[in-house]
From Swiss-Prot:
This is D site-binding protein. Residues 257-279 are annotated as: Basic motif. Residues 283-297 are annotated as: Leucine-zipper. SUPFAM superfamilies: Leucine zipper domain. CDD domains: bZIP_HLF.
Length: 325
């Protein structure tokens, strides 16, 4: 028969006894209560709760790294529970996240520093000729002090050799060539002279098609005022020829020989007039082109002189500050 709820009293622990009892008495009381049948098995939830409370009261080992201190009494011993007996309110070193450490994406990596300068690009930018290769055909290796040490990444293997960026390889060779160029600065090769006839001025010149037709020989190539060159003999002034006195020939003397001679003279005079007019037309069209080209070149000369005066002023200030080159 089941007992009423009022008669059910919790049985003593098997291994524990009342306070003040002799050691070993708890075991006898537990055995007696087990034989009498009035003991009740423990619930698993209560056992787990007591085990957590027992672990919470034990002092925890300090964890290396940044820790967070919880609020509590300053004179409380290690492992003491504060805040109404709650195990979560105890004071002492508690492991926590490193809130004061910089984030990974906020770190500044030294990859934006400029280590090398392309000397040829610098010289071309300032209108100077590029540096010639050093004698021997081999450029000296760059100084090891200026070579940045490669930083191994997280996915790099120990057997892989460090590789430099492709943009720095030609810059290092240029830097080595610059060292040999500074040593032989006085023996720099001057640029080869340019043929003035091959230089073309960028300009818009459109002559009249009728003038070009009058300046061209029929059946031949069209006259080009940009490329045509006259010889010194053609440009010499022609003397004025005096017209011969006209001789009156009587009608009875105008025979067949006279008319053939007159015909040949007229044809020769016509050819001479046509050649002279053709040459005059060519010279006039060529002169119009040269006048326009000359005006454009004068403007370029003025701009070049202004730029030259500016560079001379910069050079004089540099020499006054750093001495003669």
């Amino acid at each position: 028969m089941a007992r009423p709820l009022s008669d059910r009293t919790p049985g003593p622990l098997l291994l524990g006894g009342p306070a003040g009892a002799p050691p070993g008495g708890g075991a006898l009381l537990g055995l007696r209560s087990l034989l009498q049948g009035n003991s009740k098995p423990k619930e698993p939830a209560s056992c787990l709760l007591k085990e957590k409370e027992r672990k919470a009261t034990l002092p925890s080992a300090p964890v290396p790294g940044p820790v967070l201190e919880t609020a509590g009494p300053a004179d409380a011993p290690t492992g003491a529970v504060s805040g109404g007996g709650s195990p979560r309110g105890r004071s002492g070193p508690v492991a926590g996240p490193s809130l004061f450490a910089p984030l990974l994406w906020e770190r500044t990596l030294p990859f934006g520093d400029v280590e090398y300068v392309d000397l040829d690009a610098f010289l071309l930018e300032h209108g100077l000729p590029p540096s010639p290769p050093p004698p021997g055909g081999l450029s000296p290796a760059p100084s090891p002090a200026r070579t940045p040490a490669p930083s191994p990444g997280p996915g790099s293997c120990s057997s892989s050799s460090p590789r430099s960026s492709p943009g720095h390889a030609p810059a290092r060779a240029t830097l080595g060539a610059a060292g040999g160029h500074r040593a032989g600065l006085t023996s720099r090769d001057t640029p080869s002279p340019v043929d003035p006839d091959t230089v073309e001025v960028l300009m818009t010149f459109e002559p009249d098609p009728a003038d070009l037709a009058l300046s061209s020989i029929p059946g031949h190539e069209t006259f080009d005022p940009r490329r045509h060159r006259f010889s010194e003999e053609e440009l010499k002034p022609q003397p004025i020829m005096k017209k011969a006195r006209k001789v009156q020939v009587p009608e009875e003397q105008k025979d067949e020989k006279y008319w053939s001679r007159r015909y040949k003279n007229n044809e020769a005079a016509k050819r001479s007039r046509d050649a002279r007019r053709l040459k005059e037309n060519q010279i006039s069209v060529r002169a119009a082109f040269l006048e326009k080209e000359n005006a454009l070149l004068r403007q370029e000369v003025v701009a070049v002189r202004q730029e030259l005066s500016h560079y001379r002023a910069v050079l004089s200030r540099y020499q006054a500050q750093h001495g003669t080159l």
